[in-house]
Amino acid sequence: MSLESLTSNLWTRHGPSAEQLLSDRRTKIIATLGPSSRGPEKIKSLIEAGANVFRLNFSHGSHEEHLAVLKDVRKVSAEMGAWVAILQDLSGPKIRISNVEGDYCPILDGDPIELRFSQDKANLSNATTIFVETVNPMTTLKPGQRVFLADGILELTAEKVSSDHVACRVAKGGRIRSRVGIAFPDSDVDLPATTKKDFADLEWGITHGVDYVAISFVRSAEDIDQLRKVINEKGSAAGIIAKIERRAALDNIEEILTAADGLMVARGDLGLEVPLEQLPMLQRKLIEGANYCGVPVIVATQMMHSMITAVRPTRAEVSDIAAAVMSGADAVMLSDETAIGEHPQECVRYLSRVALAAEQTFEFQEYKLRLRDADTQTVPDAIAYAACAAAIKTKAEAIIACTETGNSARLVAKYRPHQPLYGLSRKETALRRMALYWGVRPIFFDSGENHDFEIESSLKVVQARLKIANGTRAVVTGGRSTKTPGSTSILEVRQMNYL
């Protein structure tokens, strides 16, 4: 590919318009809500900038705080006519330190520092003593072993283990914040994927209708099945996102992909489990595996870390985002950048611009070759594959997936069609779930009681909403029974002549 052809489809130095960002971008954006981004006006600005999914991090905040945020998201998105999903991220058994005096404090290279075990909230960490929750460092560490804080940004070395504390030395200093994660990479710490707190938080999430639940530190499909049982018993439609953070998850990735509704490449904790130089290769392999199975995959952690304080991303961050998009990621996620950062709206806007630019060079043909042997044994999957092929052969300008659960749209997205993809449903839960799927633009419509009405009304809705010219072809998928999940078995190529 020549430099001229590579740049011919990109924009001027001013970048794409806000309208382009929202209408053209296929990769979805997840923004974590926190102190920097709470409140109706800030949430509205993030949606306008391009956020599709909002993450509630249950490692921080109370149920009351999260409920206020959830209500704001639902109210604002309804007023804007935007289908936005809410992702509840369970904290899992992540080992954390206590709150810090003054919320943060510096520790310097070479300084002595003690680790102590405490579950008393009154004990505050400082520059000389760090209180560890969940795991007793005295029974976990041996002299010479490493201790990582804040995803490895800070590093300690254990020097002496006593009955009531572990004496350490700061190997890599920095600033510690309240309740940051702490890891023992040289120790074998075996903790369950889901804690009592997680089940209490999950109960809250189901009660208040979250769209996705992320389970941390997954080891196997059994962890997901355990969570699924609770969700199903409560009658919830929430999808489960498996966060890949442990070596055990890598060993069991095939069964995890079969059990989960989505995958998150959680590079922070995963980068503590494997050598950092292996992380890019693992990320690519995880994306390929999820793509092959048609499971949405999210790339997360430090996507734009510098923008917690800086007004623009680094060149390396921009390249990292582009690499994730061009590898086939369905979504990219912002964490501290939007939760506690100084420029949450700008972070989302930059991320949207970079993702959209990267998509202009996405190798659709190479991607389809990668998927040519993918599982198309089910009828809905075969229909999805055929819809993408038919759209190319007939020069259709849109693909419409009429769906009860959102699953049909997800399957079409698996094959990464060039054409705009619209997911039409009468169910709000399905419309919000589709907010995570690559390239899917959710639209509400009442499917009616029969197939013919469904096809006609879907074409009318899409043409009227998007002002598509008469005579334009569209590929439509649906089922004979319009309100039966999993019944997609029909594909039609139709002309839109309703304006």
Q: Model-predicted segments: where are they?
A:
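Non-catalytic helical/linker scaffolds that mediate oligomerization, partner binding
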Residues: M1-L499
